[in-house]
Amino acid sequence: MKNTLAETNPENKRRKFLKQLLAGTMASVAIPVIGKSISEEKQRPAWPLDKTVQNEAYWEMVKKQFPVPSNLIMLNAANLCPSPYFINELVASTMKELEMNVSFQFRSRFAEKRKKALEMMAAFIGVSKDEIGIVRNTTEANTLIVNGLDFERGDEVIIWDQNHPSNAIAWEQRAKRNGIIVKKVTLPPSPKSIDELMAPFFNAATSKTKLISFSHISNISGMALPAKEICKTARDKNILTLVDGAQSLGMMDLNLHDMGCDFYTASTHKWLLGPFENGILYMRKENTQRLWPTVISAGWKETSTTVDEKLCVLGQRNETTPFALPETLEFHLSIGKKNIEDRVRSLSANLKEKIKAKVPQATFVTPLSPEMSAGIVIINLPGKQPAEVFQKLYEVHGIAGASSGGIRLSPHIYNTLSDLDKITDALAALAV
């Protein structure tokens, strides 16, 4: 049977995107070619950032690659992001073909694409392909670690009180089940230094502490923790580290080996701009044998040594979403990981300044320091309930944010400076 996947419209979308990038005002900018390998990608020069990060003509072009109506502004990257047109169409067309042909022969391509996705994701985050597995989301990845680590009664786990429930309540349930001790630490809301963010974790540590588990970036305050410094200090004390990267994968230019964490979890449907039901589970190679598998299905082997084969054999699942992971990563690399981080940081910093100027009565939950924050901006308006403002922003102004920890706004590369003006105008109107 003829393979039509390579001839579908998503590929045309990618070609069109590349032509647009190379056209007009962007002709002088060195741009990676979509579809090239990651090794080739790293050999090509990066964009000149002084010409790109603030080049609104370019980012307006990027915005057009997403299926967001002109009357809506999406500011909920911390929860869910749209995918580019061609990713949506690739998933849809693959699902359609699967429904037409569920044979083992047709489905063999999913295993091939999964292998490619693992290789590309490993390079994307600076690890070995044997150290990562594809799961369905961050929650599942966290759960596999919480339930898989062979801790004993009396062993201690230290968690941040701003962790996601899958990295907090899950530990508390584990404590009730077999007697581990969970210590929860609170960090200062307005830290003056990195040391103030680290000290509470290590002040709580004892000789029985086995793991420190924390969100890289909090979804309820926007605070970014010094992951590399925490991981290094923990390693020096023979303490494992789990970094929940739900808010950093796809937003930050990551290298997990450089970060030094023992475990890292994330999803692709947030900042990575990928399809639903994809997550990653990373662990340092020497930690693979520390975990018991939580789920065992057909194809699992006790002799498996890779993370994907030992811990991520989860039974029948929707394989059309991992099928689009390589293209998702290619899209990111075509723009540049550092360029994306710089752009998001620029947008969030700009948003903070505009709020301070136009809505001076607003109070910031998120630290103003760029060293202690990233892409998430959370504020409160005096006398206003965040849930009420959140609803009116959407219903009256067409702005989609969130009400987690306050009024949460998280811009991404599909947002522009003109979007930020509309947002701050709306906040000023609602603050009255």
Enumerate the language-model features and the residues they cover.
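Pyridoxal 5′-phosphate
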Residues: 2-432
